[in-house]
């Protein structure tokens, strides 16, 4: 529900895997802006929770040749990495190239065992075996700006390869997690991904009008490899790439056109259109997500009124339309296995389809109204209210298989409707002589909210545990974030911050699954010129508000030095 933009284009990978992270070069980030309220209407229904806008470093104002080298090390997994950048600014042109690489070993964790499918698996030396990896990134950015015209062009490629902990992949087997004496090797099972992105911005400005267009192509190719294993004896070894368990090849075309009209010094309007087309192809001897293609388009209007430096009011509306076509997928080997297990033909017919063909169309509107009030330099108040909706993802409609990154069998529901809800948030900031306080409460009500829920139903797939199914329900969210910041003795800063989220399933009068616990951070920082040292105590509370068939989680304390 949060869109991530890089150079004006939404990042599109396999978002069904929250364990995947973002295929972005962390060294190549100039500024990060967080957008909430009406401004998020510019980016589509999947930005209902806000937008993280990542932009490249600013262009130098004078002609020059420049570069930098950055080195990185981490003790938690023995990371060794670095990045090299070279850039040139000449007249109307600016160009930059960057290469980054990281190598890391097995992750250290503060436990000697984990539980996988009710079995305790040892963690030798408190290192997760085979979780080492490598990352290689290269990117090129160029910009031309002259008078009223501006254009930029970007090409990037991100490659990652990471091992899977073998104790939570496939059939439980303690012998697979025995220490092999090498904490930096990558053996089967592992995952690898390559993300190619090509984007361009074209912009022309008149006195009171700015016309801009963002266009992009992305290819996200993710694969998961594991020594061929079958839970059904009749499944033969594939002739080609026998150890390729899962593969997803996602192609995305994106385009957006926006017109910004500056009516006066206090009034500004924006009109826009955007569209996106995706196609996802699959391969491998296992199944998690079917092939599909998806198209979305939207129209938007946004306006901002700022009569003075004290108050600013903004509002906007957006209409989105989407279409998704999901292909069916039959598992004949599962059907044979179930027959041998004594299932009747009606049950076999039900379970043998990993996914059924689905054709769905969605259309709905969103709107938002926001206020910023700054009565003085010390005080600032913000408030937003709006209606939002989101199209269901392909995984929410049709996933059906074991997701090894999170150790669970995830299943979609083709009957899900679009997500719809009302959201309201506010914030208050006070700054006074080295002291600041910030409080940000929020509340959201969804008439239909889609979430992954533990069902308590045992999967017919062997060694898969219970099924986690995407479900729609009426839901209430409420919570707050708060921060107190104190600057003292010239070089010291103390910050205490906390966050709390309350979730409630109105249909069944219980909490939502995977509700985050209350957490707090106490951070003491010393800084002088370019040198900064800090110590932090992070407290995570116990979570007793859980869904049915979900375990309670104990609290934890983490201590950080940096």
Set out the residue ranges of the language-model regions.
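N-terminal periplasmic accessory domains that precede
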Residues: 1, 5, 19-22, 34, ...
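Transmembrane beta-barrel wall of Gram-negative outer-membrane proteins
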Residues: 77-103, 116-165, 194-207, 259-267, ...
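Transmembrane beta-strands of outer-membrane beta-barrel pores
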Residues: 71-77, 90, 101-105, 146-148, ...
């Amino acid at each position: 529900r949060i869109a991530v933009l890089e150079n004006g284009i939404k990042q599109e990978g396999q978002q069904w895997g929250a364990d995947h992270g973002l295929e972005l070069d962390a060294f190549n980030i100039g500024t990060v802006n967080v957008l909430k309220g009406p401004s998020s209407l510019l980016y589509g229904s999947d930005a209902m929770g806000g937008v993280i806008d990542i932009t490249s470093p600013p262009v130098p104002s004078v002609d020059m040749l420049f570069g930098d080298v950055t080195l990185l090390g981490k003790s938690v997994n023995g990371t060794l990495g670095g990045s090299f950048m070279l850039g040139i600014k000449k007249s109307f042109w600016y160009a930059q190239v960057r290469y980054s690489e990281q190598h890391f070993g097995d992750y250290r964790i503060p436990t000697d065992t984990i539980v996988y499918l009710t079995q305790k698996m040892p963690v030798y030396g408190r290192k997760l075996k085979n979780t080492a990896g490598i990352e290689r990134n290269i990117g090129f950015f160029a910009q031309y700006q002259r008078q009223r015209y501006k254009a930029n062009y970007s090409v990037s490629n991100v490659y990652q390869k990471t091992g899977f902990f073998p104790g939570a992949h496939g059939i439980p087997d303690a012998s697979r997690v025995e220490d092999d004496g090498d904490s930096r090797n990558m053996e089967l099972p592992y995952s690898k991904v390559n993300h190619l992105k090509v984007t361009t911005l074209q912009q022309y400005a008149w006195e009171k009008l700015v016309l801009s267009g963002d266009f992009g192509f992305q290819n996200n190719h993710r694969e998961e490899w594991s020594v061929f294993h079958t839970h059904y004896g009749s499944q033969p070894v594939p002739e080609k790439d026998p150890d390729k368990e899962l593969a997803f090849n996602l192609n995305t075309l994106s385009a957006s056109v926006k017109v910004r009209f500056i009516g006066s010094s206090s009034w500004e309007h924006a009109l826009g259109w955007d569209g996106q087309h995706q196609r996802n192809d699959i391969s491998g001897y296992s199944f998690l997500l079917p092939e599909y293609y998806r198209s979305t388009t939207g129209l938007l209007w946004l306006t901002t009124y700022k009569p003075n430096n004290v108050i600013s009011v903004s509002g906007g509306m957006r209409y989105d339309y989407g279409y998704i076509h999901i292909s069916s997928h039959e598992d004949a080997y599962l059907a044979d296995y179930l027959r041998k297990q004594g299932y009747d033909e009606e049950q076999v017919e039900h379970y043998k389809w990993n996914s059924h063909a689905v054709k769905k169309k969605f259309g709905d509107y969103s709107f938002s109204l926001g206020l910023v009030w700054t009565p003085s330099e010390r005080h600032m108040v913000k408030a937003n209210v709006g209606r939002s909706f989101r199209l269901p993802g392909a995984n929410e409609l049709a996933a059906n298989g074991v997701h090894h990154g999170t150790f669970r069998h995830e299943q979609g529901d083709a009957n899900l409707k679009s997500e719809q809800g009302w959201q309201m948030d506010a914030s208050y900031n006070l700054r006074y002589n080295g002291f600041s306080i910030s409080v940000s409460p929020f509340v959201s009500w969804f008439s239909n909210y889609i979430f992954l829920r533990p069902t308590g139903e045992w999967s017919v797939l062997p060694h898969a545990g219970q099924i986690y199914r995407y479900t729609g329900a009426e839901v209430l969210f409420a919570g707050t974030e708060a921060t107190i910041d104190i600057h003292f003795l010239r070089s010291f800063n103390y910050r205490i911050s906390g966050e709390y989220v309350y979730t409630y399933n109105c249909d069944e009068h219980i909490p939502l699954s995977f509700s985050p616990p209350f957490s707090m951070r106490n951070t003491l920082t010393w800084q002088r010129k370019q040198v900064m040292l800090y110590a932090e105590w992070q407290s995570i509370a116990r979570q007793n508000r859980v869904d049915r068939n979900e375990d309670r989680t104990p609290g934890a304390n983490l201590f950080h030095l940096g």
